[in-house]
């Protein structure tokens, strides 16, 4: 009989004393509360400098899983780009310079696209502002902005403030015009809903879609129709004669300034894959010789990379594999990349002895319509694996508290927490029945703050601490831990030596 050591990541499950707007506190969760009271527990910092982000910056799923899997603080792309801008290296970046040189020589246009907000999860508008300033400095005349509106990592009706900030930089530099506006629901899909991506692509390339004289008018009209930032239909900004301000054409260059890959891959593939077949792009398929991605998005995206990956050697998965142990990664679609690619330090391939189980997320418009998502199917599949003695190490993600938490709606999020608690109980009992040990934690907060103090929906992540429980009574845990300390703690429990690259410290005293 194998005695599994399981890491259970309750995505978006933060801890906060105040109960107002707190779905985690208001939900009935007898299993979690029981384990918290019965077993050694502490809290971990999952935001800011503790996870390689700027101070005060909320954590997110990519950052959380990278830090947990690496067993160290992983300095995030946001921080890397900020430092490059501060130290003057950004303007010297070879990929940016190559794209600029190309459009200047050919007399073509430079298109900047990405998420327009200061959320810092997928992008930061300051990086786009740095690109506008660089284009102005280098004398690029035709610079067009394809803005993806956020409303998810920031407030649901904040787009106007970001458009205003962009207009200030356009005024300051003398370059840049808004060309298209799209809610991230369309432009940043990651779940193969290609019909959404197609609407965005057609606006950018063909000028198809609702038309407006300005970005402000687009947002105002959407709000008047009850459509907020995340869901704004891909729209085209037009000149006085109703022709598009710009479309993307042959020999233009693109700089896609999102730094987080998962929601950038699909739209990037449409522009970079010669054999793209997910939808018919039509007669006009622009040849973009210089398509620059801020970071490495995927092997499936044929673009240049401005900030190349940092190698993360000896992540938890690799160390476990080298020790000859069998490991399982399991999640539903929305969090599958996180327990695989991100948890393995940006590695797509499996390690020896690693098995993966993907359970499809339900096909619904938004997850508040189905707060349980596919958690029962994930749980059934995992309990079956545990009962069959197949794995020494298990990495599990329950997506609900994060994915439903993004709705900013209390009732569905409470249901999500309660479904998570029910399934947590089933998984932990199966592990304890095998004389195994579970480590229960989260990658960041979300469901712990669903309402602002004004009673408005709070759709973003939080900076609250996350739980850490070890279902083993003969250990004592220290305080002041961080996500990067979880892997060393698991290795301690497994009796596997911690490699020097893993600079986190075990939480077991």
Swiss-Prot record:
Cofactor: Mn(2+)
Disulfide bond entries: none
Gene Ontology BP, a term: glycolytic process
Co-factor binding details: Binds 2 manganese ions per subunit.
Gene Ontology MF terms in the entry: manganese ion binding; phosphoglycerate mutase activity
The protein, known as: 2,3-bisphosphoglycerate-independent phosphoglycerate mutase
Family recorded in the similarity comment: Belongs to the BPG-independent phosphoglycerate mutase family.
Keywords: Glycolysis, Isomerase, Manganese, Metal-binding, Phosphoprotein, Sporulation
Pathway noted in the entry: Carbohydrate degradation; glycolysis; pyruvate from D-glyceraldehyde 3-phosphate: step 3/5
Species of the source: Bacillus anthracis
Positions contributing to Mn(2+) 1 binding: 402, 406, 461
InterPro entries from the UniProt entry: Alkaline_phosphatase_core_sf, BPG-indep_PGM_N, Metalloenzyme, PGAM_B_sf, Pgm_bpd_ind
Gene that this polypeptide is encoded by: gpmI
